[in-house]
Amino acid sequence: MGAAASIQTTVNTLSERISSKLEQEANASAQTKCDIEIGNFYIRQNHGCNITVKNMCSADADAQLDAVLSAATETYSGLTPEQKAYVPAMFTAALNIQTSVNTVVRDFENYVKQTCNSSAVVDNKLKIQNVIIDECYGAPGSPTNLEFINTGSSKGNCAIKALMQLTTKATTQIAPRQVAGTGVQFYMIVIGVIILAALFMYYAKRMLFTSTNDKIKLILANKENVHWTTYMDTFFRTSPMIIATTDIQN
């Protein structure tokens, strides 16, 4: 994605669209009793992310799956070309999917339908389920706020988790780069200040500090009558350089 701020914007947009699609296409509601509750949400490496859980439950698991995919497709379509360019690498890192900008929607849909319709997911009858995410990074100076929408079914939550893995992978791809970039900028500024300070001291010394010979010359210049030998002594205080040492033969 283009910037860390855009990650938060995209996450917010995605959450709003998922809630809206679940309500419209799966008759989900925040007031509906959920067959599955989220017990705990674990982030193995949390570097500044906040997670909240929102219930939008219904009895139609297939409609939930379609609603989540529809929300993801619309959100991806609204990204800028620069943001879309990041997405294939995130799919590979988060879900081990080899994809491209042009096929990412279809590949994600296939992944979700295959994974979330598997018997391991469908036959999961646990009433309280835990969600585990590998890692998440907050933007420099501010946390990244994520929302996990509980659909009340294993299939729906499977699709939600796949999207959550992608969004958290986006934070791990971008936030550390910005932190590193900030560090480089800081050191460049420090080096620049040191160079400018050295130049200032050099010219200040040339302008403000006078050598002993120059001081004598200034004093003599201010006197009215000075014998010519004094000038000679002042201007030739330093011994002349020896140009040649070979004896001259007559």
Curated annotation (Swiss-Prot):
- Disulfide connectivity for this sequence is 34-57, 49-136, 116-158
- Asked if Transmembrane is a keyword of the record, the answer is yes
A Gene Ontology BP annotation from the UniProt entry: virion attachment to host cell
Parts of the chain on the Intravirion side: 205-250
Lipid modification (N-myristoyl glycine) maps to 2
The listed locations are: Virion membrane
Entry superkingdom: Viruses
Topology Virion surface: residue spans: 2-183
Instruction: Report residue spans for region: Targeting to MV membrane.
Output: 2-12
A Pfam family of this chain: L1R_F9L
TM spans, by residue? 184-204
Task: Report keywords, A-Z.
Answer: Disulfide bond, Host-virus interaction, Late protein, Lipoprotein, Membrane, Myristate, Transmembrane, Transmembrane helix, Viral attachment to host cell, Viral envelope protein, Viral penetration into host cytoplasm, Virion, Virus entry into host cell
Output the PTM entry: Myristoylated.
Asked whether the UniProt record includes Zinc among its keywords, one would answer: no
Name the InterPro entries on file. Virion_mem_poxvirus_L1
Task: Give induction info.
Answer: Expressed in the late phase of the viral replicative cycle.
Q: How does it sit in the membrane?
A: Single-pass membrane protein
Q: Which GO terms describe its cellular component?
A: membrane; viral envelope; virion membrane
Q: Which family does it belong to?
A: Belongs to the orthopoxvirus OPG095 family.
- Quote the subunit structure annotation: Component of the entry fusion complex (EFC) composed of OPG053, OPG076, OPG086, OPG094, OPG095, OPG099, OPG107, OPG143, OPG104, OPG147 and OPG155. Except for OPG095 and OPG053, each of the EFC proteins is required for assembly or stability of the complex.
Task: Give the protein's function.
Answer: Component of the entry fusion complex (EFC), which consists of 11 proteins. During cell infection, this complex mediates entry of the virion core into the host cytoplasm by a two-step mechanism consisting of lipid mixing of the viral and cellular membranes and subsequent pore formation.
Name the chain's protein.
Entry-fusion complex associated protein OPG095
Q: Which species? A: Monkeypox virus
- Name the gene: OPG099
